[in-house]
């Protein structure tokens, strides 16, 4: 087995490389951060620096040579960006990579999507894979849904490659650059965390290692009989109030900080104002309408399909995941400017 991991220099992809190397699996990794690429090489991975939005066929040929399984973790995940940027990174890059994978004989293509395509500014619990909102919440969600359509079309036309879609909810852990780092920044700079409804939203999260474990299961021969392009929700399977998760992080980090309850409408007005000025400056604001709303609404997934069909069970609990993440942040100096 030889696995190509895209988006390997941060987040899920970075954790995926470590997971595979710990199993002794041959790994080829690609990403844009060449400094991190050197660290991946020291772990025993073969690193090829590349920007998938600019990849040409000659580069793809080298990247995919000898690969039988591809874990496509690369994605533009910001809540702030243009339609063109999301389409280029999440739709076009996925289509071209999928086409090249088929051409060069990749047997398994695991595509990392997002439950954001379910989000519609309403409370939802135990969301199943076939749920769709009346309209997508933002360009990111729309682009991830479009990337899944690309995967579906590729699967229909190419039966010799099995495509898998995984939708992990609220990923966190070592090498995270999104949710936890932003929370920590707020804790450090303001000494408080502002949460709508006091953090009473019931949410699901996914520790990176659990998501990678699901990717591993989906790549095994026992899953070959499953329909190509089938989608599975992935989470820790431990819905908690957002407040309890944030408080656990505060306690583990030992930061002097308190959680402040702010009315959702007030926080949303602030976020919309920041978005207005952000549009003028082209800079991502500290708060966005989408980001604030994700903190306000109940949002949990039904993972029974993954449990029954992939044999998925989380291997790291939510509490242990937060403890490990806090330890990693402290060990790597992420609590200082």
UniProtKB/Swiss-Prot annotation:
GO terms of molecular function: oxidoreductase activity
Claim: Nucleus is one of the keywords in the record: no
SUPFAM superfamilies listed in its UniProt record: NAD(P)-binding Rossmann-fold domains (SSF51735)
InterPro entries tied to this protein: Epimerase_deHydtase, Lipid_A_modif_metabolic_enz, NAD(P)-bd_dom_sf
This protein's UniProt keywords: Lipid metabolism, NAD, NADP, Oxidoreductase
Cited Pfam families: Epimerase
GO biological process terms on file: lipid metabolic process
Gene3D superfamilies: NAD(P)-binding Rossmann-like Domain (3.40.50.720)
Entry EC no(s): 1.1.1.51
Catalysed reaction, written as an equation: 17beta-estradiol + NAD(+) = estrone + NADH + H(+); 17beta-estradiol + NADP(+) = estrone + NADPH + H(+); testosterone + NAD(+) = androst-4-ene-3,17-dione + NADH + H(+); testosterone + NADP(+) = androst-4-ene-3,17-dione + NADPH + H(+)
Keyword set includes Lipid metabolism: yes
Family according to the record: Belongs to the 3-beta-HSD family.
Function description: Catalyzes the degradation of estradiol into estrone. Can also degrade testosterone.
Other noteworthy facts: The degradation of estradiol by gut microbes containing 3beta-HSD leads to a decrease in serum estradiol levels, causing depression-like behavior in female mice. The prevalence of K.aerogenes and 3beta-HSD is higher in gut microbiota of premenopausal women with depression than in those without depression, suggesting that the estradiol-degrading bacteria and 3beta-HSD enzymes are potential intervention targets for depression treatment in premenopausal women.
Protein name (database record): 3-beta-hydroxysteroid dehydrogenase
Naturally occurring in which organism (per UniProt): Klebsiella aerogenes
């Amino acid at each position: 087995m030889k696995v190509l991991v895209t988006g390997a220099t941060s987040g899920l992809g970075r954790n995926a490389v470590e997971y595979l190397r710990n199993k002794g699996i041959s790994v080829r990794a690609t990403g844009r951060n060449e400094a991190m690429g050197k660290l991946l090489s020291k772990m025993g991975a073969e690193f090829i620096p590349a920007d998938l939005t600019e990849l040409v066929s000659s580069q793809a040929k080298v990247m995919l040579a000898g690969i039988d399984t591809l874990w496509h973790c690369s994605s533009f995940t910001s809540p702030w960006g243009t339609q063109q940027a999301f389409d280029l990174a999440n739709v076009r890059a996925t289509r071209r990579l999928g086409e090249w994978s088929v051409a060069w004989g990749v047997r398994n293509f695991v595509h990392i999507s997002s439950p954001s395509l379910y989000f519609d500014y309403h409370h939802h619990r135990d969301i199943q894979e076939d749920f769709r909102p009346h309209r997508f919440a933002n360009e990111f969600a729309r682009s991830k849904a479009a990337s899944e359509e690309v995967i579906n079309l590729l699967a229909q036309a190419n039966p010799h490659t099995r495509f898998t879609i995984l939708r992990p909810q609220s990923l966190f852990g070592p090498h995270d650059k999104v949710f936890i780092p932003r929370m920590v920044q707020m804790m450090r700079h303001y000494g408080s965390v502002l949460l709508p409804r006091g953090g009473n939203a019931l949410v699901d999260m996914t520790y990176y290692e659990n998501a990678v474990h699901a990717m591993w299961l989906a790549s095994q021969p026992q899953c070959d009989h499953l329909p190509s392009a089938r989608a599975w929700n992935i989470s820790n399977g431990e819905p908690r109030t957002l407040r309890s998760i944030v408080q656990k992080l505060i306690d583990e980090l030992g930061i002097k900080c308190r959680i402040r309850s702010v009315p959702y409408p007030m926080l949303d007005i602030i976020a919309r104002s920041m978005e207005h000025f952000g549009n003028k400056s082209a800079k991502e604001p500290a708060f966005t309408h989408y980001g604030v709303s994700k903190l306000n609404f109940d949002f949990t997934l039904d993972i029974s399909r993954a449990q029954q069909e992939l044999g998925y069970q989380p291997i790291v609990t939510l509490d242990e995941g937060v403890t490990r993440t806090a330890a990693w942040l402290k060990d790597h100096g992420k609590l200082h400017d």
